Curated annotation (Swiss-Prot):
Name under which the protein is recorded: Ribosomal protein uS12 methylthiotransferase RimO
Organism in which the protein naturally occurs: Stutzerimonas stutzeri (strain A1501)
Keywords from the UniProt entry: 4Fe-4S, Cytoplasm, Iron, Iron-sulfur, Metal-binding, S-adenosyl-L-methionine, Transferase
MF (Gene Ontology): 4 iron, 4 sulfur cluster binding; aspartic acid methylthiotransferase activity; metal ion binding; protein methylthiotransferase activity
Pfam families, alphabetized: Radical_SAM, TRAM_2, UPF0004
Keyword Transferase part of the UniProt annotation: yes
Membership in a protein family: Belongs to the methylthiotransferase family. RimO subfamily.
Length: 440
């Protein structure tokens, strides 16, 4: 019997890239390849890269170099794959380079290096209907579209992943159903722009379980909300149509959680970023959302040190944060990106030391807000999904916490717990980012 061909896989970048990796791995497994966790056991290594900012590109190039040094046979795919000349300039020995979403080309490149076994592999029959997943069994990412129709001046995603292409809602719901049947208890909806879902299809009617459903965020959320699992929305653009899903959150159909990357608050900076400059309306909208759904958790990300940002702009942002009282916030110092429109706008660069100072002040400011908001949860009861268990106890997340990016809930329980368990707890303590609780 011939040796089963083996593939090593390195997946970098955001959850969208994770889903791409899962799709490639599933196809390779269906064709009889064995996925191995070490360089030395792999016949070929695939590196799924990130090319969003320069530091991500550097990390991708380092990962490619490590794979070449440890194995020698390397195929590169993902967002940085659109910059093949740069990759080959640094690593001329890579065997093939493909861009994001080019699943077939990646698999074909693997075929060229190590052909699939012509003998039937009985393990192929064990590939689960939901495919190979890189996340724990109890949660999974559900990608509803590719690409983005915006042209934010700091971003090159449209040039890497193209314009918005929405998946038909029936396909998305079928995948979600397979995940739920496989035991997934939390579905994280992701895309480049979740609130624009279906725009490119003109919200076309599709069919799900024999019923017509519009390819639109509201209808998607309504149907996902019937599946009996946590549904969490990520990468939501602050459009007015976001208002439509808040009642679903208030009714407990989907999690009261919105991930909205506001990026800044100063109208001048937002205009330079080519983002919606309606900060006053945004504050009013946040207030309205919380009136409808008091439990709503809002996560966001911001950029400080964008070219042209003044101290006045930055102070405006801090004041806006005080007013907005966001729950979960991340912040990045602006990083120049080759090919991003911001690099050609002739705006005054912000010196690195000022970027660092503003980042430090931003984080301290938001940390105080986060600590105060979490302190309000002490004494309250929450449902917690357990992610991991060690000798010190269990660690989980509430509806207010997305995996890997938000805080955690440290759970004290007299009964043994397992990852994927959902338990009711009472919060006993809080710090700036995390909670401590006991099972009730």
């Amino acid at each position: 019997m011939s040796k089963t061909p083996t593939v090593g896989f390195v997946s970098l970048g955001c959850p969208k890239a994770t889903v791409d990796s899962e799709r490639i791995l599933t196809q390779l497994r269906m064709e009889g390849y064995q996925i191995v966790p070490s360089y030395e056991d792999a016949d070929v290594v695939v590196v799924n890269t990130c090319g969003f900012i320069d530091s991500a590109k550097a990390e991708s190039l380092d990962a490619i170099g490590e794979a070449i040094a440890e194995n020698g046979k390397v195929i590169v795919t993902g967002c940085m794959g659109v910059d093949e000349n740069n990759i080959r300039g640094v690593h001329p020995s890579v065997l093939a380079v493909t861009g994001p979403q080019q699943y077939e080309q990646v698999v074909n490149a693997v075929h060229e290096v190590v052909p699939p076994s012509i003998e039937h592999d009985p393990f192929v029959d064990l590939v689960p209907p939901q495919g190979i997943k890189l996340t724990p069994r109890h949660y999974a990412y559900l990608k509803i579209s590719e690409g983005c129709n915006h042209s934010c001046s700091f971003c090159i995603i449209p040039s890497m992943r193209g314009k918005l292409v929405s998946r038909p809602v029936g396909d998305v719901l079928s995948e979600a159903e397979r995940l739920v049947k496989a035991g997934v208890k939390e579905v994280l909806v992701i895309s480049q722009d979740t609130s624009a879902y279906g725009v490119d299809l003109k919200y076309k009617l599709d069919f799900w379980n024999g019923q017509p459903v519009k390819t639109r965020m509201l209808e998607l959320c309504e149907e996902l909300g019937k599946m009996g699992v946590w549904v969490r929305l990520h990468y939501v653009y602050p459009y007015p149509n976001v208002d439509d899903v808040i009642p679903l959150m208030a009714a407990g159909k989907i999690l009261p959680y919105l991930d909205i990357p506001f990026q800044h608050a100063s109208p001048k900076v937002l205009k330079a970023m080519k983002r919606p400059a309606f900060e006053d309306k945004t504050l009013a909208r946040i207030k309205k959302w919380r009136e409808i759904c008091p439990e709503l958790t809002i996560r966001s990300t911001f950029i400080v040190g964008f070219p042209g940002e003044t101290e006045e702009d930055f102070q405006y942002l801090l004041d806006w944060l005080t007013e907005a009282q966001l729950d979960r916030v991340g912040c990045f110092q602006y990083s120049p990106v080759d090919g991003a429109p911001a690099e050609a706008m002739n705006l005054e660069p912000v010196p690195d030391e000022i970027k660092q100072d503003r980042w430090d002040r931003f984080m301290a400011h938001q940390q105080a807000i986060s600590a105060a908001r979490l302190q309000l949860k002490v004494g309250k009861e929450l449902d917690v999904l357990i992610d991991e268990v060690d000798e010190d106890g269990a660690i989980g997340r509430s509806w207010a916490d997305a995996p890997e990016i938000d805080g955690m809930v440290y759970v004290d329980s007299e009964q043994p717990l397992q990852p994927g368990d959902k338990v009711r707890v009472r919060v006993t303590n809080a710090d700036e980012y995390d909670l401590w609780a006991e099972v009730i």
